[in-house]
Every structure is written in structure tokens, then in C-alpha cells.
Regions:
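Short beta-strand->alpha-helix junction loop in the catalytic core
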Residues: 1-6, 65
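Nucleotide-activated donor-binding/catalytic signature segment of Leloir-type glycosyltransferases, i.e.
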Residues: 61, 68-93, 103
Length: 170
């Protein structure tokens, strides 16, 4: 389970202001920066998201071996004004950063012919407990953490159109 006393809706107005996101539709993604988590597809879907929501901003919280690749994707797609990398934060700060978002997204996907999948995806439950709708990838246990159409939407983590449409819908 999750600590619902820790992960609950919080006022992130000051954090959003500090990050320059007070007038943005913030898509927050929290997790280790690795291929399986689908952060690359989230970045690649941003142009489609921006067509529907020109004020959208992707806030990526976490660190990992995929950071350099993700930063290159941001540069290649001219998204530096629309994507922020926060890096590692303390556990105590997680709810405030999650609540800085309007929607939580981590379109995870399976790798290596299904041998590498997302586990339960507890971060989806934490985001839901914070009051955010979630977009999860259909990988491993992640779909089990989302009540389709109630707490969020499960998408094909490789389908940029599905990712963008789900985020626009929520």
C-alpha cells in the first residue's frame, strides 16, 4: 500500500511559482529515468500535446542513466521551453512535486520480449492519492494501479497519439 497521510492533495502554488509554471498545464512524471518508464515517448508526444494544449509543460522528476538521451530528445524537438528536468528530490518532497502537476504521466512499456516490465507501479497510486489523474503504460502491473476512466487512462506506451490524446482528455 501507500502512505495516504504522506501522499495526499497539497497546495503546490509556491512550488509552481518557483518553477515558473503557475500558468501552465503541468504534466508531471516521477521516476527513475530509464527506457522502460517511457519518458522518451512522453517527450516525443509533447508536440502533439502542445497542439491541443499550447500551455502544456512536462515536469520530469528523477534521475537515471537515460537522462542524457532524454535531454537530447528535448533539444532535437525544440522543447526546452516546454520540458524541465528536476533531478532527484527527497522523499518528503514527493507529494508537493506530484501535486504541482495537473496530470501524472508515465507511459511505461515492456522491453526484451516482455522480460523487462513495469512492476506494480506504486507511483501511479501515489499520484492518485495526491488527487491527480494518471496516464499509465500498458506494461506489467501498471494497468492494475489505474481504474480505467476513473483514476486515469492506460495507453500503449509506444503510441504517441494515444499518449497525447490521454493527456489532453485528462
Amino acid at each position: 500500500g501507500i502512505d495516504v497521510d504522506h501522499f495526499s492533495p497539497q497546495d503546490s502554488t509556491q512550488l509552481r511559482k518557483h518553477l515558473g509554471l503557475e500558468r501552465k498545464k503541468v504534466i508531471v512524471s516521477v521516476g527513475r529515468l530509464v527506457h522502460r518508464k517511457g519518458q522518451d515517448r512522453l517527450i516525443e508526444s509533447m508536440p502533439k500535446i502542445l497542439e491541443k494544449s499550447p500551455d502544456a509543460h512536462l515536469l520530469m522528476v528523477g534521475q537515471g542513466p537515460y537522462l542524457e538521451h532524454l535531454a537530447k530528445l528535448v533539444a532535437i524537438n525544440n522543447l526546452s521551453e516546454h520540458v524541465s528536468f528536476i533531478g532527484r528530490i527527497q522523499y518528503a518532497e514527493l507529494p508537493e512535486y506530484i501535486c504541482a502537476g495537473d496530470v501524472f504521466a508515465m507511459p511505461s512499456r515492456s522491453r526484451l520480449a516482455g522480460l523487462e516490465v513495469e512492476g506494480l507501479g506504486i507511483v501511479y497510486l501515489e499520484a492518485s492519492a495526491c488527487g491527480l489523474p494518471v496516464v499509465a503504460g500498458a506494461s506489467g502491473g501498471a494497468p492494475d494501479a489505474v481504474l480505467q476512466g476513473v483514476t486515469g487512462l492506460v495507453v500503449d506506451g509506444n503510441n504517441l497519439d494515444e499518449i497525447a490524446e490521454a493527456i489532453a482528455t485528462l
